[in-house]
Amino acid sequence: MKITRLTTYHAAPRWLFLKVETDEGITGWGEPVIEGRARSVEAAVHELAGYVVGKDPARINDLWQTLYRAGFYRGGAILMSAIAGIDQALWDIKGKALGVPVYELLGGLVRDRMKTYRWVGGDRPGAIIQQITDYRALGFDTFKFNGTEEMKLIDSARAVDAAVVKVAEIRGAFGNTIDFGIDFHGRVGAPMAKALLRELEPFKPLFVEEPVLAEQAEYYPRLAASTSIPLAAGERMFSRFEFKNVLCAGGIGMVQPDLSHAGGITECVKIAAMAEAYDVGFAPHCPLGPIALAACLHVDFVSHNAVLQEQSIGIHYNEGADLLDYVVNKDDFHCVDGSIAALPKPGLGVEIDEEMLKRANENPPDWRNPVWRHSDGSIAEW
């Protein structure tokens, strides 16, 4: 079998799909994208196509190493996302060719279902409480929400109090009947992160995500020493080499690589194993589409330290299309009591409606993340 062609499709709300074709008629799907930089990743995918067209798709490890090492300059968000999407598609092809789900190729199941959590939006406690109430009725008991809006490097007691009041109201509304993570989203600098963690500790969040930006990873062990709240990070780390440094330094209780940003299945299986060796949980970041979610689930199902899976089915920011709109076999992704069962179909287990994708690609989205500014006019982290 040889790879013959790579085709990309843009689709609302902010996704890029990749179809990899072979001379035997077996196709694989991947999702290589950086939110807000889809065209940059698309260009990288087609630039890398020359390394894979004409090659045997079954040699996934060799192709991955070629894509990563054949360029003198390597790594980074764009290239690793391009590699990720190609890698996902190669695993999809191999599973379909052999008639088994990808998790069987990775050694088989360590669990039968994977616990997922719901992201809930809004900055007012009442809006978040209502969303949690609605999702609890569907069987979910674990959630995540943003901890704060933009925050200055050194900010006021009012800013801290606003974040604390929101969390206090949510915990007060539900008691310990729910768990929640709080996402700082890299909006908080190290000085304020320490203050916020101290004030939030009485409300027992399940974790705090991106307490500081990945560029400030040296603060993770210092912040961890100041709190009992588990810290999570990794959505803006793109290879096992970045995770190596963080794991060796300590401080992180949960790693969150993105299967569409951090080199795909091949790389993230290694990251999960590295984390397990350090007694660190694995909870892939996934605010993206169905192929990214499927890739995450296959790694979750073979990783003993996988603790939670993010997913964006029905989430408020999926404007123009929802996660399962491009999927034929929607029932395979059905959540029961907040968990998704092992995907039964060969490969990644996603049947894509390509005709719908083609129509979506005729009117491609141009999503970009908001640009925030502080009151003095300086740029703020979103």
From Swiss-Prot:
Catalytic activity: D-galactonate = 2-dehydro-3-deoxy-D-galactonate + H2O
Named cofactor requirement(s): Mg(2+)
Coiled-coil ranges per UniProt: none
Active-site annotation: H185 (proton donor), H285 (proton acceptor)
InterPro entries: DgoD-like, Enolase-like_C_sf, Enolase-like_N, Enolase_C-like, Galactonate_deHydtase, Mandel_Rmase/mucon_lact_enz_CS, Mandelate_racemase_C, Mandelate_racemase_N_dom
Site (Transition state stabilizer): residue numbering on this chain: E310
GO molecular function: galactonate dehydratase activity; magnesium ion binding
Any one of the GO BP annotations: amino acid catabolic process
CDD domains per UniProt: D-galactonate_dehydratase (cd03325)
UniProtKB keywords: Lyase, Magnesium, Metal-binding
Keyword Signal appears in the UniProt entry: no
Residues reported in the UniProt entry to bind Mg(2+): D183, E209, E235
The EC number(s) this enzyme carries: 4.2.1.6
Site positions (Increases basicity of active site His): D258
Region listing for Disordered, in residue ranges: 361-382
Cofactor note: Binds 1 Mg(2+) ion per subunit.
Pathway assignment: Carbohydrate acid metabolism; D-galactonate degradation; D-glyceraldehyde 3-phosphate and pyruvate from D-galactonate: step 1/3
Pfam families hit by this protein: MR_MLE_C, MR_MLE_N
Function: Catalyzes the dehydration of D-galactonate to 2-keto-3-deoxy-D-galactonate.
Misc note: Reaction proceeds via an anti dehydration.
Entry similarity comment: Belongs to the mandelate racemase/muconate lactonizing enzyme family. GalD subfamily.
HAMAP family from the UniProt entry: Galacton_dehydrat
Protein name: D-galactonate dehydratase
Organism: Xanthomonas axonopodis pv. citri (strain 306)
